[in-house]
Regions:
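Mixed-charge, Lys/Arg-rich low-complexity intrinsically disordered regions
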Residues: 320, 326-369, 485, 489-512
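Short coil-to-beta transition motif at edge beta-strands of beta-rich domains
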Residues: 17-19, 24, 356-377
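Charged, compositionally biased non-catalytic regions
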Residues: 281-350
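Compositionally biased, low-structure terminal segments
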Residues: 2, 49, 308-314, 357, ...
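Extended charged low-complexity segments that act as oligomerization/scaffolding linkers
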Residues: 1-297, 388-514
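Short beta-strand-centered aromatic/proline hotspots
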Residues: 378-387
């Protein structure tokens, strides 16, 4: 049986099939000129081809970049990016702008290599200062606020720089060294740079007074992993490797990516996603012989049958086709993961797993649908209206069914497990949907019918009307529901099934012991 590391290496190799090499001195195919990186361009092209990877070569020009952006990034798995673009003396700024594009907008690209003739540590420091959660203007403000202590801060700059690199590993030793020798300075820094943690405040202090690194003009996400030995890091869902120019070849890349994701604490689910993506590319299709027997005219007739949301219907059919195709495929990653006993220290990770299994937050404006969860006045509501009725609200006069829930603790949610009717909305919110006062009483989920005049969720909010009784008088009251997340279909269906048995319950009487 393959080890976890061997499995990771194979998954990554299968995941990278389309790459692009970006350098201002690259030699593009069919070009007569012979720029500085001609030999490297040809060598890389052949090396990647021998490994079953299609490599495109792009000669970077700031003038043409926006015109060619779709060509550069569309359907790429890997980007090889020169650290110095457009003849920059010290390099970095243009490359970091492209890295921003990859990390924040080209989210299908999971792998990036920055190759350089500079020292790898220097490039890593610049990436960390650019992707740090603070802007160039904010760092200038930090320097002004801490100006009185600038000389003292400069004395501990080596420790602050090391803290940044080792923030996920050996930071406590370095932090305690500052606390022991510079307690007053530490308090002063923490007062002026307010962050989620003392460690973060110190890292930002070091970056503010490092005049040799590049800062971003906008807020960028922070890394979730840094390896200062391998010179690798993870930002969002992108793994970034910094390599010397002479070391750029597919074998070294696969080895480095494999080592990085194998040692990355959160890498296992990234590998699971990559393997599913590999299986989907290789073996699964939205099209089979039955669908190829359908003409545009026949499909048009089905659409014409009073089908307001035919697009949703067709998309769901295609997704179910894909799910059935994937159902029997083997995940090699599972065999490489050892079985483990319950560990109280991992409660936060167990919770994150349940959030992933249970829900997905959809940020865009959309019509209300089956499984959508809302928050209002400290209570929670989940839409349990059938999908077909959600798609055509007019057929039910815009009346929607909801179940109402209350907040519970993370510990209680984990104790209940799949034996109750609970939902993991995110890492901070957990909801119980059933009404039950004691263990001897039956579990009830009571459906509520609410009027939704406009079924579109806009800016995460939707208005709902409810019939209420105040002082014996009935009236319609309007509430603003705030969208939280969407519970996945099978979990919502379980809640809905139980809720709709409530109206058909039958009351009986027995003599019972008190």
């Amino acid at each position: 049986m393959a080890t976890y590391e061997e499995t990771a290496h194979k998954i990554i190799k299968d995941a990278i099939k389309s790459a692009i090499f970006i350098d201002e001195n690259a030699k593009e195919p069919y070009s007569d000129d012979k720029p500085q990186e001609t030999d490297r361009s040809i060598a890389l092209y052949n090396q990647f081809k021998d490994n079953g990877i299609s490599l495109s070569v792009y000669k970077y020009s700031n003038t043409n970049y926006l015109t060619h952006k779709d060509y550069i990034f569309a359907n790429r798995d890997l980007v090889l990016l020169d650290w110095k673009l457009e003849g920059e003396d010290h390099g970095g700024e243009k490359s970091l702008e492209l890295l921003d594009e990859i990390v924040n907008r080209q989210r299908h690209i999971h792998f990036c290599v920055i190759y350089t003739s500079e020292k790898e540590d220097y490039v890593l420091k610049n990436i960390l200062s650019y992707f740090s959660g603070s802007t160039k203007a904010e760092y200038e403000d930090f320097k002004i606020d801490l100006a009185d202590k600038e000389e003292e801060i400069k004395e501990i700059m080596p420790i602050l720089n090391e803290l940044s690199l080792k923030r996920f590993t050996d930071w406590k030793v370095l932090y305690n060294e500052i606390r022991r020798s510079k307690r007053e300075l530490l308090s002063y820094i923490l007062e002026n740079i307010v962050c989620d943690s003392s460690l973060c405040s110190l890292i930002k202090c070091g970056m503010a007074f490092d005049n040799d690194t590049i800062k971003s003009n906008i807020q960028e996400p922070c890394p979730s992993s840094i390896d200062c030995v391998l010179h690798t890091l993870c930002i969002e869902n992108t793994i970034i490797i910094i390599l010397n120019k002479e070391d750029v070849n597919p074998d070294i890349l696969f080895q480095k990516f494999g080592e990085t994701i194998s040692t990355y604490r959160w890498g296992v689910m990234q590998l699971a996603g990559l393997e599913m993506q590999n299986i989907q590319k290789k073996n699964c299709s939205f099209i089979d012989e039955n669908i190829l027997r359908v003409t545009r005219k026949a499909l048009g007739y089905h659409r014409n049958e009073d089908f307001d949301n035919f697009e949703d219907f067709l998309r769901n059919v295609m997704l179910e086709q894909q799910a059935l195709n994937l159902r029997d495929e083997k995940l090699t990653l599972v065999e490489a993961i050892d079985r483990e006993p319950y560990d109280e220290k991992l409660q936060e990770e167990y919770t994150s797993m349940n959030v992933f299994y249970n829900s997905v937050c959809l940020k865009k404006n959309k019509p209300i649908s089956f499984g959508d969860v809302f928050r209002c006045d400290g209570e929670y509501y989940i839409c349990i209206t059938a999908l077909c009725d959600c798609a055509r609200p007019g057929k039910r006069n815009n009346s929607f069914y909801f179940a109402k829930g209350t907040s519970i603790t993370c510990n209680d949610a984990l104790k209940i497990g799949d034996g109750g009717f609970i939902s993991y909305l995110n890492n901070n919110e957990y909801v119980k949907w059933n009404l039950k006062s004691s263990s001897d009483e039956p579990v009830y989920i009571v459906p509520e019918s609410l009027l939704v005049p406009c079924n579109l969720i806009v800016d995460q909010k939707i208005e709902v009307e409810k019939l209420v009784f105040e002082n014996g008088v009935s009236k319609i009251k309007t509430y603003v529901f705030e969208y939280v997340t969407t519970i996945k279909q099978n979990y919502t269906q379980r809640i809905a099934n139980h809720a709709f048995t409530h109206p058909v319950r039958v009351g009986i009487d027995f003599v019972k012991k008190k």
